[in-house]
Each structure stands twice: as structure tokens, then as C-alpha cells.
């Protein structure tokens, strides 16, 4: 997860039909969202949110992400441990 960030979550998002790209653009305005991708399958988007604590991540989800118009539902997964390869 990076040295400056202590907590991360991945969020699977279901969007209203046709709103996927619009929501992806709006997520660019949420600084804690460090990655976001359109998907094919059961979910429409996956996003990664990083912050200083789980409390901060919860606040970002409740006050910023979940309030974006067109988001129908989310499934949040809390990162416990991991690594990332730099290419």
C-alpha cells in the first residue's frame, strides 16, 4: 500500500444503466480514490480508496462516493495485507 497511506479498501460498484462513464469521471474528483476501472460482469466499476485510517475511509464512502448520483449499490472489501508490483 504505499508508505504514506495506512488503510485501503476496494469497492465494487453497481451503477444505473448508462451512468458508468459519468460516475468514473466524477470519481476523479475524489482525491482518496487512487484507482478506478470500468468492468464487464456483475459489477460495473471497481475502485481503490486509500487513506490514513479505516475511519477516514468510511467517511469517504459515506460522504463522497455513496452520494454520487447513479450509484445503485456498493460492496466494500477492506485490505488486510498485500503488495503491488511497480512496472
Where are these regions (language model features)?
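A compositional/biophysical signature of low hydrophobicity enriched in polar/charged and small residues
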Residues: 1-87
Amino acid at each position: 500500500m504505499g508508505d504514506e497511506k495506512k488503510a485501503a479498501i476496494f469497492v465494487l460498484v453497481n451503477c444505473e444503466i448508462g451512468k458508468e462513464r459519468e460516475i468514473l469521471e466524477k470519481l476523479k474528483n475524489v482525491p482518496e480514490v487512487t484507482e478506478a476501472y470500468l468492468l464487464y460482469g456483475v459489477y460495473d466499476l471497481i475502485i481503490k480508496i486509500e487513506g490514513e485510517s479505516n475511519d477516514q475511509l468510511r467517511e469517504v464512502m459515506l460522504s463522497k462516493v455513496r452520494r454520487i448520483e447513479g450509484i445503485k449499490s456498493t460492496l466494500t472489501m477492506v485490505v488486510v495485507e498485500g503488495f503491488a508490483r511497480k512496472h
